[in-house]
């Protein structure tokens, strides 16, 4: 047998990571109960009969607020570890964080001027 310099472990893990979901999905498909009537395909809403259609159109403002929220939520996720380790990182990390915050402030000003934060 020849030596792959440790790549056989990576290949083994890749194979295992590929086989486990395939086996789990196959087992669930084999073991699940089949059949069921038309009631099984209806929407369940707190035990009440659904009223109206499921295809309603949401206002685009909800999506704009959600996108702005996600952007600044990700900003918080990136800035929190930096703030925790601030005393050990030094001046270069401080300057990098300031550049990151400046880019996000520019994005906030852009969204504000485009009217993404207004509900009217």
Swiss-Prot record:
The keyword Glycoprotein does not apply. Its main location: membrane. It is an enzyme of class 7 (translocase). Keywords: Membrane, NAD, NADP, Plastoquinone, Quinone, Thylakoid, Translocase, Transmembrane, Transmembrane helix, Transport. Belongs to the complex I subunit 3 family. Coiled coil: none annotated. InterPro entries: NAD(P)H_OxRDtase_bac/plastid (IPR023043), NADH_UbQ/plastoQ_OxRdtase_su3 (IPR000440), NDAH_ubi_oxred_su3_sf (IPR038430). GO terms for molecular function: NADH dehydrogenase (ubiquinone) activity; quinone binding. It comes from the Bacteria. It is a multi-pass membrane protein. NDH-1 can be composed of about 15 different subunits; different subcomplexes with different compositions have been identified which probably have different functions. It is found in: Cellular thylakoid membrane. NDH-1 shuttles electrons from an unknown electron donor, via FMN and iron-sulfur (Fe-S) centers, to quinones in the respiratory and/or the photosynthetic chain. The immediate electron acceptor for the enzyme in this species is believed to be plastoquinone. Couples the redox reaction to proton translocation, and thus conserves the redox energy in a proton gradient. Cyanobacterial NDH-1 also plays a role in inorganic carbon-concentration. GO terms for cellular component: NADH dehydrogenase complex; plasma membrane-derived thylakoid membrane. The chain crosses the membrane at residues 7-27, 64-84, 89-109. Its EC number is 7.1.1.-. It catalyses: a plastoquinone + NADH + (n+1) H(+)(in) = a plastoquinol + NAD(+) + n H(+)(out); a plastoquinone + NADPH + (n+1) H(+)(in) = a plastoquinol + NADP(+) + n H(+)(out). GO terms for biological process: photosynthesis, light reaction. This is NAD(P)H-quinone oxidoreductase subunit 3.
């Amino acid at each position: 047998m020849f030596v792959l310099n440790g790549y056989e472990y990576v290949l083994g893990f890749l194979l295992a990571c590929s086989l486990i979901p395939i086996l789990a999905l196959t087992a669930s498909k084999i073991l699940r109960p089949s059949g069921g009537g038309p009631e099984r395909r209806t929407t369940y809403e707190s035990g009440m009969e659904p009223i109206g259609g499921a295809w309603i159109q949401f206002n685009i403002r909800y999506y704009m607020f959600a996108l702005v929220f996600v952007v600044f939520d990700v900003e918080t996720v990136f800035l929190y570890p930096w703030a925790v380790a601030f005393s050990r990182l030094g001046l270069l990390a401080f300057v990098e964080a300031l550049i990151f915050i400046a880019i996000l402030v520019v994005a906030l000003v852009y969204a504000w001027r485009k009217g993404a934060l207004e509900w009217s």
